[in-house]
């Protein structure tokens, strides 16, 4: 580990992540066995999770990406900015939004409403990480990898100021850390 990562505390191992993502892929494959869903990955954080999840599904599917920003450092800005929209037509299609983490719920609520506005057949949400009790959502999160404590996490695509996405396990930054 580099100096900036020495203060991190491991939350989830590579094996725990791999096993859970594979289980999520199997569950999605069963639920969508008669469909050709469109997986919409939320950039940048979900790209590693999305790739592993897609390798775990056994159904035909399509892929697109959307990019929003709501964080600056370790704090949510409270506003969502759309940086890249989807490019495919989702009208009448089953859509699965693939998110890295649901924390405040602002991003996923914005995305869910935006996707619903394009008149898909259905919209499901798959998230690797979920901080329960914090997000106030008026829809269900269909596929949850892990429920985690209210800590700031990095690794496996999740970042702190665009750094530490490359870590193959998920770590949390201890409270009071000067990272």
Show where each model-derived region lies.
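PRPP-associated nucleotide enzymes
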Residues: 1-179
